[in-house]
């Protein structure tokens, strides 16, 4: 932005900001004068020195309306320039705006353009950074014009010469030096900034671009093409910075009031020589202040020191030039000046940075002022301090309403002081502001009355740090309270993640009318009951409230008055108040409203022993007719608070039921009723928790008597395992895994029994059990440790990369009630301490993940209603996922818009029409309809909006259950929804004390449904084995990998569930047979992969040599030897190679089948041994992830997926469908070939020792892994396309959150982020567009580039066309056809042409960090990371920031373009009744009514 001399800075509207390199002219245009002296202030007078760094003449007066010498004082002399001291009489605030300059004695290279990677200057001149450095720092001369002497000596332009070579030429050709510098025959070589300046000035960008494009097309050398491309990018950036200005000399719109720029400032684009500075700008003195300290010393900004060095060296150099000092001295001084300017602009890049005298730290340069957390962007522009705010400790306010908070009087009077003063003066209570202040200080009683009136209807905002999602700031209506702590409603604690152990909260006051309205309409706590991340309620009762409701609604048999029949709920209450009936008694009530059907009244009726058969039969009939209700007194009391529309809730109310109920209320009766209900159940909950007197004593933790028996049995089992190991039938790995399994099972059995014991104790009224069962406090895991056994403990890992933790195989048999032995205690401290240290370390990681997510998605805003796409996303029903507790089918489709009709295939009924929202009811219906296997829904991933996304593709806004409005910042909501639970994830291990759980390796797989078995791709062999009792046992063993067993419905043939059958599994069912639910279908060994003989024959070892490819380990305890394949590479010479494999040969010695054996395999056969089909020849051990609850694996996993990193040991994936064959073996790798029926073949090289999953002859599909390891998302994108990788990322991230933390995040949030990761494409062939090969550009920009050449042709032969038409040019088809018509008419040669070629590209998957840095907005990218690099690139290319996202608008201080800040709300007309107001330029003027504003919104 350019301000003319004397004009004040831009106050008006601007819509975009352009970045470019400052030319010397523009620096001088900004400047108010040259800084000539390094002095700042006079040490005696403390006044700024004239012409120094603080000079008043240049930068403006230090006192308002007063010149330096004091001749002019007072405002009446405004604008006069003093004739004595030359200072303009104005306000001192101009010292924040006015700039100066330093005129350099020699040109100096700007370090940003020289040191950036790749170096901009280096790319233009085709010099390496090392060579450039030698020229710039005056070590060598560079030839600018070889002239005649150069030609004779064979010297070319840009050659580097040493001092001797240079002087040799100069002395040899003395006459040559008399020629003018512009003479082409003169030999010119220079060094330093001057040389670079001349070279850059002489560059012809257009010619360079043509030459480099030619190299790209014609060169065969890969290196040359890569270099040319790197250079071309910089050349094109400079050329593009010219383009917009070639056509018009008008200014970019909105910067200046006039139509034209003032003449000197016509922007001509960047010239390369601007990268070398002749003038250095000096920033305003208020931005680098001198602050007086006590003791007469001054604290100064580092910039002043850096400027001082530049000025001192510059002045010294000028003097030396004047006195014609020797070249050596000059050169040294010039080099020092270059270094001083380098340090001023960027002091952190250099190894020898300028340090301060006393503390020896590097000085903060201009770059450092922008960079990092403490830089200008993040510290001051994105993180401003707020006035009208205060903070205090929070305490609970149980008597508050949901929308209220208690504000201490002392805080309120301070915050609302200006408003109170105004009221006091207006009402005549105080004469002046001063006297009003006195009244307030005296705490006059009238002040409190006024304060009450002032705060009436004025919301305040409460915020608790860290603000992880939007519910971390909510609005409340304040109530004045005594004391010094803020009171908050207990139900909003969950949203703030607050508790009352000393947490503090900040209060902010919305000042403007608009802010107050937005606070009370959008941010009021009673309007924010639903969590945006999942659409589930967030204001859910917890702890005491849950316990109270649970206690109230629980039934107890034989309580006072059981079996009585009441005429109405009112009668029940009267009887209870008269103590005729107990709180938990089961009674009958006549009820005519809706009834919640989840309670099995008839079953309970059968358990009531005191009823006669006759009475029982009558009651049964009445219950079935729904005239009478079997319930408890407590439930009647509870239902007094439930709105009639919901009906009678006849269940025990625990946390889960309460959450469900609040969710129903908010969608069925609205927020107002729900808020009332919440306040009522809060009262009820606290009241009955108090009445129940529920507290835990040691005797409530009951240890089951059977515990000792189970432990004995487990000890027997583990002894048996050890015996087998000693016999040599198990490897050490298998022994470990089996022992862990035994203890895991035992621990679970004991836990279940202790749980059942608690449940039966005192009729289910054991306080410990009630707390657990209601969900008030504690988990089954904690009860297991209290009353069962602590079980196995995880051994903490050293690394944080998230491999599965080892488990210590000695379990802790005691529980916490019995107390631990010293050894057990010592083992368990391990896990507990890790939990605490993890917590603190990992919170930072989660915070950084959130920041990256915000940055990548901050500009995703709903911009249009419907993008009109025909594409959608297919969602399949997956029973396996649903049973393992993952997200149900209905949750995935709820709140989305159907892309196609959803049809019930069984009867062809349309359930949902295309374009219709799938509501909760419809989703439930689809879930229940067996005929719907999949649905196609609109998704953000397939949205085709140019900017932002459309509301149809996003679906409903989860927090209001309606289609998302235009202007909703869905990107930020998505980032918060993923980041907030990320921070929760980190704290997971903390509460479990690091005990190991989960991960019992399931050896038997049971049927989930009744149905018919169908085999798919299953090959088997029969095998007879001798079992433990010495009896022969016939087994059917699967020898095919990736076989499946399907359970189908015998009538319709529809597949209900699919099971993957592992290689080596034993089948317990036949193809086509019927199975019952829970019948075992097959069993497998989970701890290892087996290599199984498929045919009979004799084993022959190939390349299996003792000490080279296998080692023999004799177990010291058992004396048995075990053969393990080892990595043989270190044992052999470089040329030698081995490939360990087992071969089966027949009697004639012919090889029938070969099996490669991976490293770490244990051999179970000897050379020459006879084998039968089904015999195990070798086992490859597997690592099982057994440690549950430790999210260390979770967060790094999420980060890895979001950053689209290639896994450490990725699987090799086939790119085509086909059949597998093995090729030759090399020293370190072997070949796997995949060939299809069309003769296409792909060869993959697999590292030796990597486990190959495919066998010779296996059929594979594109995208199938051929080896062990995780599949890389980049491979999925390359082979299966963008859709597959999007689905993969969303599902994998969901799994981590689901399994590791049980956190529910709606898919649409993940889709928003994944969409941002796939926004870019990489250009492959640019065709005739102006793109470059390898360019990374936005998909929409790529489409635009192709459209620009769509109707153009390239001239191949110009014929007799006019001179303006040349070969290879692009022209519009219609222009050329018109010309050709004329040429034909005149019988001339016509123009030959061909259609212009369009560019080709492939999609790119970027990690969130790269995606955030690649964003279109310069300001947003610069404030994220790598600030200097982003700004350098933007300046060279003359980029324009159109301020489309949220972040850039916050930085420049505008309203964000989301919500009420949208452009469409700029000129709202507000009308009261019977009056017409003018359109305002602000968002709102004075609203006539609140309702009016709400309707407008």
From Swiss-Prot:
Zn(2+) 1 binds at residues 67, 69, 82, 85. Signal peptide: none annotated. Its cofactor is Mg(2+); Zn(2+). Residues 1476-1497 are annotated as: Disordered. Residues 1482-1497 have a biased composition (Basic and acidic residues). One of its GO terms (biological process) is DNA-templated transcription. Mg(2+) binds at residues 499, 501, 503. One of its GO terms (molecular function) is DNA-directed RNA polymerase activity. Its EC number is 2.7.7.6. The keyword Magnesium applies. Disulfide bonds: none annotated. It comes from the Bacteria. InterPro entries: DNA-dir_RpoC_beta_prime, DNA-dir_RpoC_beta_prime_bact, RNA_pol_asu, RNA_pol_N, RNA_pol_Rpb1_1, RNA_pol_Rpb1_3, RNA_pol_Rpb1_3_sf, RNA_pol_Rpb1_4. NCBIfam families: rpoC_TIGR. DNA-dependent RNA polymerase catalyzes the transcription of DNA into RNA using the four ribonucleoside triphosphates as substrates. This is DNA-directed RNA polymerase subunit beta'. It comes from Pelodictyon phaeoclathratiforme (strain DSM 5477 / BU-1).
């Amino acid at each position: 932005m350019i301000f003319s001399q004397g004009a004040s800075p831009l106050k008006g509207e601007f819509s975009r900001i352009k970045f470019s390199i400052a030319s010397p002219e523009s620096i001088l245009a900004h400047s108010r004068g040259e800084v000539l002296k390094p002095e700042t202030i006079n040490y005696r007078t403390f006044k700024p020195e004239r012409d120094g760094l603080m000079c008043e003449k240049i930068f403006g007066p230090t006192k308002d309306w007063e010149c330096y010498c004091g001749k002019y004082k007072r405002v009446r002399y405004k604008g006069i320039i003093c004739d004595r001291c030359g200072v303009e009489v104005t306000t001192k605030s101009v010292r924040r705006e006015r700039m100066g300059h330093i005129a350099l004695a020699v040109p100096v290279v700007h370090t940003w353009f020289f040191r950036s990677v790749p170096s901009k200057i280096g790319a233009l001149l085709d010099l390496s950074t090392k060579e450039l450095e030698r020229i710039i720092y005056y070590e060598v001369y560079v030839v600018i014009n070889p002239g005649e002497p150069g030609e004779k000596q064979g010297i070319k332009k840009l050659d580097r010469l040493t001092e001797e070579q240079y002087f040799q030429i100069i002395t040899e050709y003395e006459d040559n030096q008399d020629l003018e510098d512009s003479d082409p025959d003169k030999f010119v070589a220079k060094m330093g900034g001057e040389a670079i300046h001349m070279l850059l000035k002489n560059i012809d960008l257009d010619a360079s671009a043509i030459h480099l494009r030619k190299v790209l097309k014609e060169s065969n050398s890969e290196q040359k093409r890569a270099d040319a491309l790197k250079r071309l990018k910089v050349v094109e950036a400079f050329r593009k910075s010219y383009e917009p200005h070639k056509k018009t000399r008008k200014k970019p719109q909105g910067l200046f009031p006039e139509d034209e720029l003032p003449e000197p400032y016509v922007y001509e684009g960047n010239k390369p020589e601007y990268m070398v500075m002749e003038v250095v700008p000096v920033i305003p003195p208020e931005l680098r202040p001198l602050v007086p300290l006590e003791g007469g010393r001054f604290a100064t900004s580092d910039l002043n020191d850096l400027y001082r060095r530049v000025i001192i060296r510059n002045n010294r150099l000028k003097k030396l030039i004047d006195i014609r000092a020797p070249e050596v001295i000059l050169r040294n001084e010039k080099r020092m000046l270059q270094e001083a300017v380098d340090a001023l602009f960027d002091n952190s890049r250099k190894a020898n940075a300028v340090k301060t005298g006393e503390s020896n730290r590097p000085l903060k340069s201009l770059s450092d002022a922008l960079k990092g957390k403490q830089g200008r962007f993040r510290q001051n522009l994105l993180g401003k301090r707020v006035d009208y705010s205060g903070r205090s400790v929070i305490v609970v306010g149980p008597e508050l309403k949901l929308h209220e908070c208690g504000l201490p009087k002392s805080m309120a009077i301070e915050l609302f002081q200006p408003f109170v003063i105004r009221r006091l003066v207006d009402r005549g209570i105080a004469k002046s502001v001063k006297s009003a202040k006195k009244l307030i200080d005296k705490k006059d009683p009238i002040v409190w009355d006024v304060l009450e009136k002032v705060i009436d209807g004025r919301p305040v905002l409460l915020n608790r740090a860290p603000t992880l999602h939007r519910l971390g700031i909510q609005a409340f209506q304040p109530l004045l309270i005594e004391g010094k702590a803020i009171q908050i409603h207990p139900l909003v604690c969950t949203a703030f993640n607050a508790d009352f152990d000393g947490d503090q909260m900040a209060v902010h006051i919305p000042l403007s009318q608009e802010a107050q309205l937005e606070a009370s309409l959008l941010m009021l706590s009673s309007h924010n009951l639903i969590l945006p991340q999942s659409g589930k309620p967030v204001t859910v009762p917890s702890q005491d409230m849950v316990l109270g409701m649970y206690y109230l609604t629980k039934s107890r048999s034989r309580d006072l008055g059981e079996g009585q029949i009441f005429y109405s709920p009112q009668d029940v209450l009267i009887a209870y108040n008269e103590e005729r009936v107990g709180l938990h008694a089961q009674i009958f009530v006549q009820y005519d409203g809706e009834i919640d059907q989840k309670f099995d009244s008839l079953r309970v009726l059968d358990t009531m022993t005191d009823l006669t058969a006759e009475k029982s039969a009558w009651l049964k009939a009445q219950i079935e007719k729904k005239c009478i209700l079997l319930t408890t007194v407590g439930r009647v009391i509870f239902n007094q608070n439930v709105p009639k529309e919901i009906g009678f809730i006849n269940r025990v109310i625990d946390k889960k039921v309460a959450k469900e109920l609040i969710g129903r209320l908010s969608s069925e009766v609205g927020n107002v009723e729900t808020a009332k209900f919440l306040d009522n159940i809060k009262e009820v909950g606290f009241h009955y928790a108090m009445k129940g007197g529920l507290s835990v004593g040691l005797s409530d933790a009951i240890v089951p008597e059977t515990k000792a028996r189970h432990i004995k049995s487990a000890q027997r089992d583990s002894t048996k395992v050890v015996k087998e190991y000693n016999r040599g039938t198990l490897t050490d790995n298998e022994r470990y895994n089996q022992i862990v399994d035994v203890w895991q099972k035992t621990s679970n059995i004991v836990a279940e029994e202790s749980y059942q014991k608690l449940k039966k104790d005192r009729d289910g009224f054991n306080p410990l059990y009630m707390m657990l069962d209601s969900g008030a406090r504690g988990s089954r895991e904690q009860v297991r440790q209290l009353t069962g056994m602590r079980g196995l403990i995880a051994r903490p890992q050293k690394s944080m990369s998230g491999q599965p933790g080892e488990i210590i195989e000695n379990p802790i048999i005691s529980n916490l009630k019995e107390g631990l032995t010293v050894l057990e205690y010592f083992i368990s401290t391990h896990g507990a301490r890790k939990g605490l240290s993890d917590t603190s370390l990992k919170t930072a990681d989660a915070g950084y993940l959130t920041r990256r997510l915000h940055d990548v998605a901050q500009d995703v805003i709903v911009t249009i209603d419907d993008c009109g796409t025909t594409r959608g996303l297919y969602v399949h029903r997956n029973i396996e996922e649903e049973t393992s507790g993952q997200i149900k089918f209905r949750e995935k489709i709820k709140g989305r818009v159907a892309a196609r009709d959803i049809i019930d295939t069984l009867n062809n009924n349309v359930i949902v029409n295309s374009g219709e929202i799938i509501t909760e009811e419809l989703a439930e219906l689809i879930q229940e309809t067996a005929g719907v296997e999949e649905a196609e829904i609109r998704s953000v991933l397939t949205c085709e909006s140019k900017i932002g996304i459309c509301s149809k593709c996003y679906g409903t806004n989860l927090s209001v259950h309606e289609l998302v409005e235009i202007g909703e910042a869905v990107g930020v909501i998505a980032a918060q929804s993923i980041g907030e639970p990320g921070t929760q994830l980190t704290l997971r291990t903390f509460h479990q004390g690091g005990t190991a759980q989960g991960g019992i390796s399931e050896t038997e797989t049971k049927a989930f449904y009744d149905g018919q078995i169908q085999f798919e791709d299953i090959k088997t062999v029969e095998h007879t084995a001798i079992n433990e009792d010495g009896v022969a046992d016939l087994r059917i063993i699967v020898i095919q990998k990736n076989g499946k067993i399907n359970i189908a419905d015998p009538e319709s043939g529809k597949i209900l569930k699919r099971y993957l059958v592992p290689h080596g599994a034993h089948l317990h069912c036949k193809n086509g047979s019927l199975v019952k639910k829970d019948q075992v279908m097959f069993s497998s060994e989970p701890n290892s992969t087996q290599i199984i003989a498929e045919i009979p024959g004799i084993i022959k070892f190939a390349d299996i040599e003792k000490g080279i490819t296998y080692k023999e380990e004799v177990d010291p305890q058992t004396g048995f030897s075990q053969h393990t394949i080892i990595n043989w590479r270190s044992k052999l010479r470089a040329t030698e190679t081995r490939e360990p494999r087992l071969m089966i040969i027949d009697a004639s010695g012919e090889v029938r089948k070969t099996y490669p054996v991976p490293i770490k395999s244990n051999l179970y056969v000897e050379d020459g041994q006879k084998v039968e089909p089904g015999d195990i020849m070798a086992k490859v051990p597997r690592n099982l992830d057994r440690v549950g609850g430790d999210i260390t694996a979770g967060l790094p996993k999420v980060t890895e997926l979001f950053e689209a990193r290639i896994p450490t040991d990725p699987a090799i994936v086939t790119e085509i469908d086909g059949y597998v064959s093995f090729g030759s073996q090399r020293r370190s790798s072997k070949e796997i070939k995949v060939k299809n029926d069309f003769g296409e073949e792909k060869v993959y090289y697999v590292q030796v020792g990597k486990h190959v999953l495919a066998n010779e002859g296996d059929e594979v599909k594109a995208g199938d892994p051929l080896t062990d390891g995780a599949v890389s998302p980049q491979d999925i994108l390359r082979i299966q396309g963008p859709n597959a990788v999007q689905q993969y990322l969303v599902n994998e991230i969901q799994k981590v959150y689901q399994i590791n933390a049980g956190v529910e995040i709606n898919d649409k949030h993940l889709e928003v982020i994944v969409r941002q990761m796939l926004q870019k494409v990489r250009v492959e062939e640019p065709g005739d567009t102006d793109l470059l090969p390898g360019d990374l550009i936005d998909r929409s920009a790529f489409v635009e580039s192709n459209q620009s050449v769509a109707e153009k042709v390239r001239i191949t032969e110009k014929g007799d066309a006019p001179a303006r038409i040349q070969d290879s040019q692009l022209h519009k088809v219609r222009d050329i056809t018109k010309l050709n018509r004329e040429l034909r008419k005149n019988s001339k040669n016509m123009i030959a042409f061909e259609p212009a070629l369009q560019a080709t590209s492939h999609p790119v998957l970027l990690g969130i960090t790269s995606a955030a840095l690649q964003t279109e907005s310069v300001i947003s990218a610069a404030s994220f990371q790598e600030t200097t690099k982003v700004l350098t690139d933007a300046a060279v290319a003359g980029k324009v920031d159109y301020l489309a996202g949220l972040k850039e608008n916050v930085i420049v201080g505008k309203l964000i373009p989301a919500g009420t800040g949208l452009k469409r709300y700029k000129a709202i007309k507000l009308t009261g009744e019977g009056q017409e107001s003018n359109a305002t330029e602000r968002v709102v003027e004075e609203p006539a009514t609140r309702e009016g504003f709400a309707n407008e919104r």
